[in-house]
Structures are given as C-alpha cells and as structure tokens.
Amino acid sequence: MIDRYKHQQLRIGLVSPQQISAWATKIIPNGEIVGEVTKPYTFHYKTNKPEKDGLFCERIFGPIKSGICACGNYRVIGDEKDDPKFCEQCGVEFVDSRIRRYQMGYIKLTCPVTHVWYLKRLPSYIANLLDKPLKELEGLVYCDFSFARPITKKPTFLRLRGSFEYEIQSWKYSIPLFFTTQGFDIFRNREISTGASAIREQLADLDLRIIIENSLVEWKQLGEEGPTGNEWEDRKIVRRKDFLVRRMELAKHFIRTNIEPEWMVLCLLPVLPPELRPIIQIEGGKLMSSDINELYRRVIYRNNTLTDLLTTSRSTPGELVMCQEKLVQEAVDTLLDNGIRGQPMRDGHNKVYKSFSDVIEGKEGRFRETLLGKRVDYSGRSVIVVGPSLSLHRCGLPREIAIELFQTFVIRGLIRQHLASNIGVAKSQIREKKPIVWEILQEVMQGHPVLLNRAPTLHRLGIQSFQPILVEGRTICLHPLVCKGFNADFDGDQMAVHVPLSLEAQAEARLLMFSHMNLLSPAIGDPISVPTQDMLIGLYVLTSGTRRGICANRYNPCNRKNYQNERIYETNYKYTKEPFFCNSYDAIGAYRQKRINLDSPLWLRWQLDQRVIASKEVPIEVHYESFGNYHEIYAHYLIVRSVKKETFCIYIRTTVGHISFYRELEEAVQGFSQACSYDT
C-alpha cells in the first residue's frame, strides 16, 4: 500500500468484510459481478483448463495467457477498437495475464468462523477483550456448549431448566436431537448462541471506551488494596493488574486504528491469487500443487456440505449441523495455521500441509526470504573481525568490497577529473587497480556512510551506519563496542554492507543510524555500547596484576622473572625489591625496555589526598634511613616522612597495566568534557 506521503509500506491487520469483498469482486463489461469461488475444482482432467468458478477460474482471476480467453479467442491488449473487452461466451476479459498475481477471490462462508490467530495465539486477543477464559471460548467456538440469549419475557424452552448456561454440558446432546434442522434453527436463533456466531455477537456488543474505563477503575481499586499477606493472592492480584493493562492497551489500539472487534470473526474468506499458489506440470505429465490449494478445497467442500444441509435437507438433526459447522471452523484453522490446535493435518504421504502461516513466517517464509533476504544491488557480505584501532563510528571495508560498492561513484570521479574519457576507460583503470583509483575511492568514501546489517535483525540496532575506511584483507573490521547491538562476536559471523543511495537515506543514516548515536538500548534505556568479548579479556589481563597483597609478595619465589634488581640470600629466599617511579612515563618506559612486566608491582609517586587515608590504619612496615627520614609502608600506598613527621611524598602501589588503563580513561573523560563544553 502507499500512504499519503507516498511511502510504500506493508501492513498486516484486520479488515472488514466489505473491504474483502471490494478486493475480490469485480464487474465484467456485461455487468456481471464475479469473485466468489464456489467450486473446489482446479483444472479439468481432459482439457487441462481451469474449471469455471473454481480455484483457478479465468473469469475471477484473469486469463492464463495475455489477451486469450478460455475459448481460445485473441484480442490485442490496449486496442482502442470498439470490439468488446471480454469474451461473451466464457466471460473472460482480454487483459494481461499478470493480473493473476494480484487479483483475489473470496469464499462466502455459510457460518461465521473465528480467525485462529486472534483466538489461539498468545496472547489471545478475543479472550482479552471478552475477559473470559480461553478454554471456555474454545468450547463455544467448536460447538462443545452454548450460551443462552437474553430475550424477552415470552415463554421459552430454556425456562424449563432454569439457568441454561451452567447445565449445557448435560444438554448438548439432547437439545440438537430434540429438534429437526428447521426447528433447531428457530430455537437456536431465538434462545441459544453457539459457534463463532456467538463470539461475533459478543464482540459486536462491546463498547471499547467503556472497557477502558472499567479496566482503569478496577486497576486502581486493586492498587489501593495493597498486599494481603498471602503470597498466592498477591500473585493473582499482580496477574490481574497486568491483564487489565494489556486489555486497555488492546482496546486503545482498536480505537486508534479504527478496527472493529467483530472483524476477528470471518464471514468472507479471501482466496489468494492463483500465481501465489501455483500448479506446475513436471516431467512425466505429473502435476505439483501448492498445499494451500488442497486446504482451500477442503474448506470449500465442507462449506458446500453445510450449505446443502441448511438449504436442501429438512430432516437432518441439529447435532449434525453443529458438527458440520465445527468441521468448517477446523478447515479454516488448518488453512490459516496448520497444527495450532494439536496434531497438524497430513497428506497421503504423511507430509504436513504448509498452511498460510508456514508460507509467510520463519526464515524460509515470504518476508524473510523473499522480501527481506533477497539480494540487492550496492550490497556486499563478508566475515567480521575486531578492529580495536577504529573509532566507534567507523568500520573497515576491504578494498575488494569497497571498489565494487562504490564503483559507479569512482567512475563518475574519474570522468569528472578528466582522468578517463568514458565509462569503458574508467572500468579498465579500475580493473588495473591504478593508484589514482584508490585516491578517488577514499575521497568518495569520506562523504558516504554505509549500513551494516547482521541477521537476524530482531531490533532496530541490528542495522547501524558507519563511516567506512579502507583496510587490507578480505574481512570487515568492526569496533568491539558495537557488538552487543548486533549480537555479534568474532567467531566467524558474517555481516552485510549496504550503500544508501538517495539523499534521504544518507541523511537518515547520518542523523539516526550512526553507531555513536545509538549508545542506549531503545527498549529499556540501558547502555548498549559496553565492553564485551575480547575487550573484557583485555581489560582483565591489563588490570589483573597480583591479588595477594604486599605481604605475600615480599618473598615470593614466583616473581623470579619480574625484576632485574633482585638479591639472592643463602637462606634460599628470594627478595624482590619493588621499583619506585616518579611518574607514569618512567614506568611505561621501563616496561617498554622490558625491565618490568605488565603485571609487576611498583611504587608510583602520586598526589593523594591524605583525607582519603584511613586514620586508624596501621603501617605494615616502617623503614628508617640514616638521616632520620622513614617510610611507612601500607597495603596499597607508601608515605615518606621526615624526622618531624612531615609528609614529603606519597607513593601508591600499582602496575603498568593499571597505569595504562587509567591514562586511557583520563583521556576519554577529558575528550568527552571538551566535547560537552564545545556543544554548550
């Protein structure tokens, strides 16, 4: 469909019977209205032509061959002569055969049937709106019991038994047998209601605004009562409140979209265009048919049988009529969603029929495989690897992929700069991989974002835009912080690259889809760009160090490789003196010169506020110098004091990994603060 803003879109929802009839019916030039499928036949076994009023009827769905009717007559399509535009003998219009891809038909159901998606799927929308248990509604739909109608004070059959609603289980066999078909219809239409028609009546009587008001009042009352002290009762109250919220949201959605609740019960069943459920002839003259055709045939057979029972037969028991209505309901359920009520229906080879739900849902369904998963131009695909040196909003594209994606832009750049006279010369330069080609490619990529998508796209962060840069190799480089949004890791995952072409798409990619603009989860608001995968391992290795404290490391034989300034005593103990550094640059320089390791403990001079130091903490050791100065050694810091107990300096006990991690955090915070100050 196309909305008022000329956006092509697809929407799945409920439609009225009038809308279904408008889609499926058409008036041929002689004034006859066609569109209803009344026969369960497909092709005639002798002539191999579609049966009239059948599932492949050319009067309803259009000719099989363009401009040729069922009789074999031919007319030129679009001819402005006064010849009739349809065959007066067979009633087939002379139109293009492509009409069979979108022209629908319909089946007029003798009895209403509920749409199984809205009854059996969780949550059950019909049960939520009616505020009744799902099992009770199922028993009503499949004619297991009935409801009593509120009628006038006239004498009724049900008054003989009082409350019919609670005694129907013992009466469900006696009542249909008591009446003939004609009498049973009078009785049922006047005093009881059963089947999908009962659901339709109850849905039609609903006032959605009153439902919202009553649900809100009940929700407030439950909230004011507070906990009862009984855990089971409290859970029931919480579940009831959640149900009321869902019911109000559902009623608001029906009001907002102008959908009537009774549309969840079908009176007209749409028939798909025949090209979407084809019958194909294979080798040996055998025919292969779509499973949907067989399911449609079953619906038509049972619907016609019910019509015959109600119109031709006068002595059929009412129970048989109710049984046939149940069969029609089950046939429509199987057509829409096979197996939703239990065991799926199978063919003669014990193969499960593919229903309408099976055709459209899942990885191999119509949407994901044909509409979303099909190959498109200006797209590529490759394995992703980590790019730790990339910025958050950048991705690395291999040269092979980039030159294919941006080939048209590179050709235009070569021609504009008079480096190529025509498209053929430009393509030859690209094939030869001349240096000027890569320069123009980099210029093009600087102003053109790309979209990265990882299947399955379960939320909007499954597609994000990045600024591409050229990298060597044949893999796509990705910043590890964006992995959580894609639910990706680097164990062989693949991602697709798409190039937005229109200005609107590029603007949307820059303003809404850039990775650095999607730092929070749109669902719950939690940070989505958090360290994962290799970043967590790297941070752990960087900041691990030793966990056993200063006492355990005084004479630790495991630290033999940590230091160059080591002293060995005759007592077989190894004393490892921890080095002192005045600043972080000296410590990192010593690490680069391989004088210390990444996790080697060291003392770093630091400007530490003494108010942070606990006054009750007692030093582990005190070292005195010859001039009276002394060192107070604590678990994580060291204080150098004079004879007069004045503090000269403070050292903290850390590692090179901690120093590097702190410097990275400090630079990031300073850069963020500067960016915020520029914005303000």
UniProtKB/Swiss-Prot annotation:
What high-level taxonomic lineage is stated for the organism? Eukaryota, Viridiplantae, Streptophyta, Embryophyta, Tracheophyta
Which cellular component terms (GO) are annotated to the entry? chloroplast; DNA-directed RNA polymerase complex; mitochondrion
Tell me the residue numbers annotated for binding Mg(2+). D489, D491, D493
Q: Name one GO molecular function term.
A: zinc ion binding
> Protein name, please?
DNA-directed RNA polymerase subunit beta'
Q: How is the cofactor bound?
A: Binds 1 Mg(2+) ion per subunit.
What processes does the entry annotate via GO biological process terms?
DNA-templated transcription
Q: Which keywords belong to this entry?
A: Chloroplast, DNA-directed RNA polymerase, Magnesium, Metal-binding, Nucleotidyltransferase, Plastid, Transcription, Transferase, Zinc
Q: Which HAMAP family match?
A: RNApol_bact_RpoC1
Q: Where in the cell is it found?
A: Plastid, Chloroplast
Q: Which SMART domains match?
A: RPOLA_N (SM00663)
* Gene symbol of the encoding locus: rpoC1
| Residues that coordinate or bind Zn(2+) | C69, C71, C87, C90
Fill in the subunit field for this protein. In plastids the minimal PEP RNA polymerase catalytic core is composed of four subunits: alpha, beta, beta', and beta''. When a (nuclear-encoded) sigma factor is associated with the core the holoenzyme is formed, which can initiate transcription.
Species this chain originates from: Nasturtium officinale
